[in-house]
Amino acid sequence: MLFADFSYQYFDWWHDIIPDANEFDMNGERFEHSGLFKNKIINLGATVGINDYWNVTISQFFLERCMEWDGPVDEFGNSLTVHHRTECSSIDFFNDEGTQMAYGGTSGDARINFRYLLFNQGKGPGNRLFFGIGLDIPSSNVITESPWKKTDGEYTPHRHFYISDGAYKLNLDLQFFNKRTKFPVFWGGAFTTSLPLNDSKYGFSPSNRYQLNILALSGSNSLQKIKLGEYALSSIGLTLFVDYATRSSWDNEGDTPNSKSLLYMPGINFLISAPSGNGLGINIARGYQYYFNENASDIDEDTDIYSVTINYRTVLDKIIEKLY
């Protein structure tokens, strides 16, 4: 099976004045920070069945993250804060001394996952249970220094966002799905954990992440009349995505402010099928994020999040003879 996912994420964000921005005069930053943050993410991959119980998926992320600064600027349009400016992650970033603070690019992490079929009812109603284990391989497009580091009591120009956090990660997942003859005809979910195996070469220790994906889909009988050419609407469903992140940290800088968080995104999902067996999915979601303000360095923050994801799947009628 070959697949391609495209996701567009829109963040309308705000956070309070950064305390002690400058120990002497706060760099003149007696203002709140706000702006827009937009992610465009493509995930390309392939899944191959090794035997009747195991398959392997290899995928590669490509993405761009762009910030639109909505705070004060000077007469030339330059941001009045060293923390934010209008820029994209595809471009390198250097500070005033010419030190490279971020490596720009669009290539994200690569991923290899093995999944084992623990239980499968077959084509009819019943349960399906899968266990997965995998590895994330980091990209070199990272930031090179903590955004919260001070030099002579002041923050220097830096970038907060990045393509990769520079660490290898162990991925574990457990998936359960149930097919029924009444609504919802298909429901289930996946619990996934992502555990960093090392710090980045620049001393960043990423968060552990624990994610839950839940879905419930309708049947197709009443929807097949909705067609566009050879494509037909096969299912409408509800989704819920939950993501809990623990504290991240930098060497000699301590915990990263506002890094411990809980994100939940309810959404609606549309599945579109074709006679060839190919499938197209569209998910529209609204996100809500809660920050655990437990440390003195944490600040008040609020974000409105919207997401649209389009995924495409095609099953190849091919057999790799050496695997069977």
Residue ranges and their predicted role:
Residues 1-3, 55-57, 113, 128-132, ...:
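Residue-level detector of the transmembrane beta-barrel scaffold of outer-membrane proteins
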Residues 2, 40-44, 108-112, 129, ...:
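Hydrophobic, lipid-facing positions within transmembrane beta-strands of outer-membrane proteins
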Residues 6-12, 60-66, 109, 118, ...:
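Transmembrane beta-strands of outer-membrane beta-barrel pores
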Residues 8-41, 160:
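Surface-exposed strand-loop-strand hairpins of Gram-negative outer-membrane beta-barrel proteins
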Residues 10, 46-54, 118-123, 178-185, ...:
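Outer-membrane beta-barrel strand-turn architecture
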Residues 17, 22-24, 194-324:
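Outer membrane beta-barrel transmembrane domains
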Residues 33-66, 180-216, 228, 244-247:
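Glycine- and aromatic-enriched membrane insertion/assembly motifs of diderm outer-membrane
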Residues 64-207:
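Outer-membrane pore/translocation modules
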